[in-house]
Protein backbone atom coordinates (compact mmCIF):
# COMPACT_ATOMS: atom_id res chain seq x y z
CA UNK A 1 0.00 0.00 0.00
CA UNK A 2 1.44 3.37 -1.04
CA UNK A 3 0.60 6.79 0.34
CA UNK A 4 1.23 10.28 -0.92
CA UNK A 5 3.67 11.58 1.70
CA UNK A 6 5.35 14.97 1.92
CA UNK A 7 8.18 15.97 4.24
CA UNK A 8 8.22 19.49 5.67
CA UNK A 9 11.27 20.85 7.47
CA UNK A 10 10.79 23.51 10.13
CA UNK A 11 10.62 27.03 8.70
CA UNK A 12 12.99 28.09 11.51
CA UNK A 13 12.87 30.48 14.41
CA UNK A 14 13.31 33.74 12.51
CA UNK A 15 9.96 33.88 10.74
CA UNK A 16 6.90 35.81 11.81
CA UNK A 17 3.97 34.30 13.69
CA UNK A 18 1.79 34.90 10.64
CA UNK A 19 4.23 32.97 8.45
CA UNK A 20 4.35 30.11 10.98
CA UNK A 21 0.57 30.07 11.10
CA UNK A 22 0.33 30.00 7.30
CA UNK A 23 2.95 27.22 7.10
CA UNK A 24 1.02 25.03 9.54
CA UNK A 25 -2.44 25.76 8.12
CA UNK A 26 -1.29 25.12 4.55
CA UNK A 27 0.46 21.85 5.35
CA UNK A 28 -2.24 20.53 7.70
CA UNK A 29 -4.98 20.92 5.09
CA UNK A 30 -3.25 18.96 2.33
CA UNK A 31 -4.76 15.69 1.14
CA UNK A 32 -1.46 13.87 1.54
CA UNK A 33 0.24 12.60 4.67
CA UNK A 34 2.60 15.32 5.89
CA UNK A 35 5.60 14.53 8.05
CA UNK A 36 6.97 17.56 9.88
CA UNK A 37 10.54 17.77 11.08
CA UNK A 38 9.82 20.00 14.05
CA UNK A 39 6.27 21.29 14.16
CA UNK A 40 6.33 25.06 14.86
CA UNK A 41 3.87 25.05 17.78
CA UNK A 42 5.84 22.34 19.58
CA UNK A 43 9.21 23.79 18.66
CA UNK A 44 8.21 27.22 19.93
CA UNK A 45 6.59 25.92 23.12
CA UNK A 46 9.83 24.16 24.04
CA UNK A 47 12.71 26.04 22.41
CA UNK A 48 11.08 29.45 22.71
CA UNK A 49 10.44 28.97 26.40
CA UNK A 50 13.84 27.46 27.23
CA UNK A 51 16.14 29.39 24.89
CA UNK A 52 14.44 32.78 24.67
CA UNK A 53 12.33 32.74 27.82
CA UNK A 54 9.15 33.24 25.80
CA UNK A 55 6.76 31.13 23.76
CA UNK A 56 5.65 33.45 20.97
CA UNK A 57 2.38 31.50 20.65
CA UNK A 58 1.23 32.09 24.25
CA UNK A 59 -1.45 34.56 23.19
CA UNK A 60 -2.80 32.18 20.57
CA UNK A 61 -3.22 29.05 22.67
CA UNK A 62 -6.72 28.12 21.46
CA UNK A 63 -5.96 28.64 17.80
CA UNK A 64 -2.72 26.70 17.86
CA UNK A 65 -4.17 23.94 20.04
CA UNK A 66 -6.75 23.53 17.28
CA UNK A 67 -3.88 22.99 14.85
CA UNK A 68 -2.34 20.40 17.15
CA UNK A 69 -5.68 18.56 17.12
CA UNK A 70 -5.27 18.03 13.35
CA UNK A 71 -2.04 16.09 13.83
CA UNK A 72 -2.60 12.34 13.73
CA UNK A 73 0.67 11.24 15.29
CA UNK A 74 3.42 12.97 17.23
CA UNK A 75 6.83 11.32 16.97
CA UNK A 76 9.30 12.48 19.59
CA UNK A 77 12.81 11.44 18.59
CA UNK A 78 14.43 10.49 21.87
CA UNK A 79 17.66 8.52 21.63
CA UNK A 80 19.69 8.01 24.77
CA UNK A 81 21.11 11.11 26.46
CA UNK A 82 24.71 10.32 25.50
CA UNK A 83 23.82 10.31 21.81
CA UNK A 84 21.92 13.55 22.18
CA UNK A 85 24.90 15.37 23.66
CA UNK A 86 27.45 13.83 21.28
CA UNK A 87 27.41 16.97 19.14
CA UNK A 88 30.20 15.98 16.77
CA UNK A 89 30.35 18.54 13.96
CA UNK A 90 26.62 19.31 14.09
CA UNK A 91 25.86 22.99 14.47
CA UNK A 92 23.36 23.88 17.16
CA UNK A 93 21.10 26.85 17.64
CA UNK A 94 22.41 29.34 20.20
CA UNK A 95 21.84 28.09 23.73
CA UNK A 96 21.08 24.46 22.87
CA UNK A 97 24.27 23.00 24.30
CA UNK A 98 24.03 25.02 27.52
CA UNK A 99 20.35 24.16 28.01
CA UNK A 100 20.18 20.60 26.69
CA UNK A 101 18.81 19.11 29.91
CA UNK A 102 16.05 21.72 30.16
CA UNK A 103 15.16 21.16 26.49
CA UNK A 104 14.94 17.39 26.97
CA UNK A 105 12.81 17.86 30.09
CA UNK A 106 10.43 20.27 28.33
CA UNK A 107 10.02 17.99 25.29
CA UNK A 108 9.34 15.06 27.63
CA UNK A 109 6.83 17.11 29.64
CA UNK A 110 5.05 18.17 26.44
CA UNK A 111 4.92 14.57 25.19
CA UNK A 112 3.23 13.54 28.47
CA UNK A 113 0.77 16.46 28.20
CA UNK A 114 -0.18 15.50 24.65
CA UNK A 115 -0.56 11.85 25.68
CA UNK A 116 -2.81 12.91 28.58
CA UNK A 117 -4.97 14.77 26.03
CA UNK A 118 -5.43 11.51 24.14
CA UNK A 119 -3.00 12.25 21.30
CA UNK A 120 -1.10 9.48 19.53
CA UNK A 121 2.50 9.67 20.75
CA UNK A 122 5.51 7.59 19.79
CA UNK A 123 8.89 8.12 21.39
CA UNK A 124 11.31 7.02 18.73
CA UNK A 125 14.86 5.91 19.44
CA UNK A 126 16.53 5.39 16.08
CA UNK A 127 19.00 3.00 17.76
CA UNK A 128 16.30 0.55 18.82
CA UNK A 129 14.69 -1.94 16.43
CA UNK A 130 11.76 -2.23 18.86
CA UNK A 131 11.24 1.53 18.71
CA UNK A 132 11.32 1.42 14.89
CA UNK A 133 8.68 -1.32 14.82
CA UNK A 134 6.48 0.61 17.26
CA UNK A 135 6.71 3.73 15.12
CA UNK A 136 5.97 1.86 11.89
CA UNK A 137 3.01 0.09 13.52
CA UNK A 138 1.63 3.38 14.87
CA UNK A 139 1.88 5.04 11.46
CA UNK A 140 0.36 2.02 9.70
CA UNK A 141 -2.57 1.91 12.14
CA UNK A 142 -3.33 5.60 11.66
CA UNK A 143 -3.15 5.35 7.88
CA UNK A 144 -5.37 2.25 7.96
CA UNK A 145 -7.95 4.06 10.12
CA UNK A 146 -7.98 7.01 7.71
CA UNK A 147 -8.68 4.70 4.76
CA UNK A 148 -11.65 3.02 6.49
Language-model-derived ranges and their functions:
Residues 1-33, 45-46:
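Conserved substrate/cofactor phosphate-moiety recognition/catalytic segment
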Residues 48-50, 85-94:
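Surface-exposed, active-site-proximal loop segments in enzymatic domains
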Residues 92-148:
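NTP-dependent small-molecule kinase module
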Amino acid sequence: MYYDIEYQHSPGKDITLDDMHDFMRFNLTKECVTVFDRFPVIEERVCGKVLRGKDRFEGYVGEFDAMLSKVDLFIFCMPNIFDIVDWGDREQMDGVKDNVVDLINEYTKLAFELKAQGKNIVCYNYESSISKREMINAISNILKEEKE
